[in-house]
Amino acid sequence: MKLRIISVGHKMPDWVQSACTEYTKRMPREMNVEIVEIKPDKRASGKNAEAVQEAEAKRILEAAGRDYLVALDEHGQEVTTLQLADKMRGWMESGRDVSLVIGGADGLHDSLKHKADWLWSLSKLTMPHGMVRVMLSEQLYRGLSVINNHPYHRE
């Protein structure tokens, strides 16, 4: 099974890359994590936010293919670590690859949210893009540590 973090944005600061690598390298081969960067669409020539979101959504869906699609959205479902671990167990049992999508500066287009298998909210707060990548990487590792009864997560 492969986990893809599909993220609109590129040229992240070194600390983001370093932190994400720290967590993704801890993941076992059978749950490999790949970070796919989608170049943000520019708001040039009078493009509004919806047009930008729509163009980005098309590229995101191409990158995700037939994966189980998780869209990170502030209006999505908030879960505990144990609930996330249960979700991850389900993903593992299904055998499908999973794409987790982080939107760009304008967020995700409604069409992508409707196609998502799950809308997940890491927080109701607005966070910097790089911070979301790091938090997502850490939470995926934490969820797997719960599944494997590893002492990283403590209740």
From Swiss-Prot:
Annotated catalysed reactions: pseudouridine(1915) in 23S rRNA + S-adenosyl-L-methionine = N(3)-methylpseudouridine(1915) in 23S rRNA + S-adenosyl-L-homocysteine + H(+)
Residues binding S-adenosyl-L-methionine: L72, G103, L122, S123, K124, L125, T126, M127
SUPFAM superfamilies in UniProt: alpha/beta knot
UniProt GO cellular component terms: cytoplasm
EC id: 2.1.1.177
Molecular function GO labels: rRNA (pseudouridine-N3-)-methyltransferase activity
Alphabetized Pfam families for the sequence: SPOUT_MTase (PF02590)
Keywords linked to the UniProt accession: Cytoplasm, Methyltransferase, rRNA processing, S-adenosyl-L-methionine, Transferase
Localization per record: Cytoplasm
Function: Specifically methylates the pseudouridine at position 1915 (m3Psi1915) in 23S rRNA.
Quaternary structure annotation from Swiss-Prot or TrEMBL: Homodimer.
NCBIfam families (alphabetical): PRK00103.1-4 (NF000986), tRNA_RlmH_YbeA (TIGR00246)
Protein name from the UniProt record: Ribosomal RNA large subunit methyltransferase H
The gene coding this protein: rlmH
